[in-house]
């Protein structure tokens, strides 16, 4: 008897190709499932989720597979969006994609999979592992690997997950979609945070977190060099949006004092204070047993390179990470993912002092 795989379909080309490949294999009963988390409207006033669902319908009809829809909008606001706002208001820079994977896609969606009597959940993530019992590994396409965004998802939650695109390059996915005549073959990839869309980040955030004007201070001279509309709008290492003129070198955000509402900057992209040799990580999730010390590499943001490091577990359940060489713009609230080669060991949330000491 063939087993049933529930494909998380977003209306994009990746999940469309996942459904196509699984149907073509002939080993599974393939069922599509569209998940609505946010009711964002596009520039024409049309809900983007409605447009995406229409694309899911078109693909499901092309492939002759049944499909369902489920709304997690309420839960998404409670478990992802509310925390996103709270963290930003407190000066942190959270990663909502990591939260969404842990709280929604591989928790609530998994419950829906069980309701539909599914044996497997398949997604369009560019990573490997899951149902093969190996935990989590990078996808082979280095430009699309998404293991970073899954590093906070418990191993058990991935135990029945199929990642058909983990061994495929994005260019090949497009080619497969075009040769199969899939309706989404030329659809643009979605980018950015789903609930922000194409709007400037500041104009979005100011709808929920009030402006709080304050000083921008040059950390080296301790002189006021500008004004800001709210320290929560800025993240460590940020260059754009400071609106500071008359400097010989570009300015970068060094740190923030949320109590005094001060943003500190330094001049020059290679200023030594922009680099840190160590960090603490909390809210940890491991795919392998933690050894002491663990010699590995770490990514402190999605597009950053791997940095060699040593990881030391602490008594309070956090870990201290010491890098072989200092790393630029380590940001509190962001996600750190740990690797040995292509294997993702786990991940956590970065905790570093927000204020540099004089």
UniProtKB/Swiss-Prot annotation:
It catalyses: S-sulfanyl-L-cysteinyl-[protein] + uridine(34) in tRNA + AH2 + ATP = 2-thiouridine(34) in tRNA + L-cysteinyl-[protein] + A + AMP + diphosphate + H(+). Gene3D superfamilies: Adenine nucleotide alpha hydrolases-like domains, HUPs, Translation factors. One of its GO terms (molecular function) is tRNA binding. The record marks 125, 334 as: Interaction with tRNA. The keyword tRNA processing applies. Its main location: cytoplasm. It is found in: Cytoplasm. Residues 144-146, 301-302 are annotated as: Interaction with tRNA. GO terms for cellular component: cytoplasm. The active site is at 100 (nucleophile), 194 (cysteine persulfide intermediate). Disulfide bonds join 100-194. InterPro entries: MnmA-like (IPR004506), MnmA-like_C (IPR046885), MnmA-like_central (IPR046884), MnmA-like_central_sf (IPR023382), Rossmann-like_a/b/a_fold (IPR014729). GO terms for biological process: tRNA wobble position uridine thiolation. The keyword Lyase does not apply. Keywords: ATP-binding, Cytoplasm, Disulfide bond, Nucleotide-binding, RNA-binding, Transferase, tRNA processing, tRNA-binding. Residues 95-97 are annotated as: Interaction with target base in tRNA. Catalyzes the 2-thiolation of uridine at the wobble position (U34) of tRNA, leading to the formation of s(2)U34. HAMAP family: tRNA_thiouridyl_MnmA (MF_00144). Belongs to the MnmA/TRMU family. This is tRNA-specific 2-thiouridylase MnmA. It comes from Chlamydia trachomatis serovar A (strain ATCC VR-571B / DSM 19440 / HAR-13). The lineage of its organism: Bacteria, Pseudomonadati, Chlamydiota, Chlamydiia, Chlamydiales. The gene is mnmA.
